[in-house]
Amino acid sequence: SRAEQSRALIKLLQYVYGYVRIPLGDIGSICMCKRILKSQTNTVSGVPFYKIGTFGKEADAYISQETFDEYRSRYNFPKKGDVLISAAGTIGRTVVYNGEPAYFQDSNIVWIDNDESIVLNSYLRFCYELKPWKASEGGTIPRLYNDNIAKAVIAIPSIEEQKRIVSILDRFDTICNDLTSGLPAEIEARQKQYEYYRDKLLSFKEHKDELYD
């Protein structure tokens, strides 16, 4: 199949060059949940419904268990470990879906249904921190369209190298989070150090020729 041929080509280029640069649209479909109407929500109880304003925070709206079960089975829904992306407001914020019952606002919160034999979700999360896309400016709210995400190019090394990079960045991440009670200057210095190594690890040397079309 075309997908199998694509995976084989990617792995060949990774073997030859160490990594391959490909657009996010080539590693999986960009997905979103089915639209939830305001009339389907309440502010008291049920399955948490996250809107762009509560993404990564506490939900202030809920949907019924029945609606959740129906929509999860009939329409797009993230898998545990998928990296959700904010497509409006503060562009590019990420939340790793933990598998707990929750529903997410359509179009404003999206994810890539990627093949983890090519790129790990944990690696993707760090790539998203670099914000490889270009947000469209229009109206009062900056908007990240599916096309912006699909055309964004990232460097993907072998799975083994992805795991190594993730392990290093996870350790830096933990150190930075453990410093929340430290001196502001120390916290800032650690954060800059983390960003420096993250950028170095995720920015591979470019080749003159295109590695992937």
Annotate each language-model stretch with its function:
Residues 51, 73-129:
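A short beta-sheet element
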Residues 25-39, 53-80:
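Sequence-specific dsDNA recognition surfaces
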Residues 11-34, 186-197:
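Non-catalytic DNA-recognition/assembly elements of restriction-modification systems
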Residues 103-110, 140-159:
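A short glycine-rich beta-alpha junction/loop motif
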Residues 19-24, 47, 78, 82-84, ...:
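Short, structured motif recognition centered on aromatic/hydrophobic residues
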Residues 102-103, 173-174, 183-199:
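Short amphipathic alpha-helical linker/capping segments at the junctions of internal repeats
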